[in-house]
């Protein structure tokens, strides 16, 4: 239960419980939330004085509701205001200084799925704040458990700019 505040971007208000229905999920939401948390905790100086986190999961098969739930929880865990904007949307909404390629008071977190075959999911994850301020998890893999869910992931390579 709960309400949606009449503001933009919308935020859940007075949420008392989130229910996951059995056998209707492959654990991708929990997996991606853990990826975001690990990326947040990597190179912490990148977001040390920020107010916002924007979560871009548009290149995953997650629903809009799932993406919003992940962003909301991620914002809660990181004590930042959550958004679900892409890089372009952040520019369009005036969050980014387009000329300087800088988000002064936030970081963009993006996960891009590359492949999902034979019980192995591959993806990249990035944390971006500026043209020369970014961290990347490349060629990450997650294997499906016997129950069909993804739980743990391995980082293929780490890069920073």
Predicted regions: what they are:
Residues 1-134, 158-161:
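Flexible low-complexity loop/turn motifs enriched in small/helix-breaking residues
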Residues 2-5, 137-161:
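Short beta-strand edge/turn micro-motifs at domain boundaries
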